Amino acid sequence: MQAPPSFYEGDTLEVAKKLLGQKLVHIVNGIKRSGIIVEVEAYKGPDDKAAHSYGGRRTDRTEVMFGAPGHAYVYLIYGMYHCFNVITAPVGTPQGVLIRALEPVDGIEEIKLARYNKTDITKAQYKNLTNGPGKLCRALGITLEERGVSLQSDTLHIELVREEEHISSQYKITAGPRINIDYAEEAIHYPWRFYYEGHPFVSKK
């Protein structure tokens, strides 16, 4: 079942934790690619100095952050790596959750091809398929074309995992500082990164 619009409403930190264990789905050329979310980071503009929307900055890139929750915010870093975020909080409150890592589930062959241009890969390469925000976007075929897309769409959405299949019983959720935000002054220390401790696809222990 797709996560309903109400899933994305409310406190961004709580939404971030709720996203863990759910499945991010992208349909590419009719083929489902997906992964279980195992690591996220929350960004709470306009007060969070790590957020693109800090200080209420509105640009063509960040405009989607000010819109309705439950939409995709995709941007480029270093001019080449895409990052996928879920917009949260009410309209006008620019907050979101970065999906940092997935455990691949559906479309594994397509994911391998997207990452390595081959399907015969090593165990080490398999562990690197989706253990980072840029890697997972490449694996699932998420690009700037998906910026602003509603997560109620048929082709891009969060699929709720049934309780009996949810991996939360196997892993403890750990909170810690976010990664690669050296510019963010005191916000460097906010414990707004949430991940499944010990999961092999987490990007950084």
From Swiss-Prot:
Which Pfam families does the entry mention?
Pur_DNA_glyco
Q: Which GO terms describe its molecular function?
A: alkylbase DNA N-glycosylase activity; DNA binding
Q: Does the keyword Transmembrane apply?
A: no
Q: Which cysteines are joined by disulfide bonds?
A: none
Q: Which InterPro entries match?
A: Formyl_transferase-like_C_sf (IPR011034), MPG (IPR003180), MPG_sf (IPR036995)
For this UniProt record, the keywords arranged alphabetically read as follows: DNA damage, DNA repair, Hydrolase
Write down the superkingdom of origin. Bacteria
Which Gene Ontology terms describe the biological processes this protein takes part in? base-excision repair
EC numbers, comma separated: 3.2.2.-
Where is coiled-coil annotated?
A: none
| NCBIfam families linked to this entry | 3mg, PRK00802.1-1, PRK00802.1-3
| PANTHER family found in the cross-reference section | DNA-3-METHYLADENINE GLYCOSYLASE
- Cited HAMAP family: 3MGH (MF_00527)
Q: What is this protein called?
A: Putative 3-methyladenine DNA glycosylase
- What are the top taxonomic ranks of the organism? Bacteria, Bacillati, Bacillota, Bacilli, Bacillales
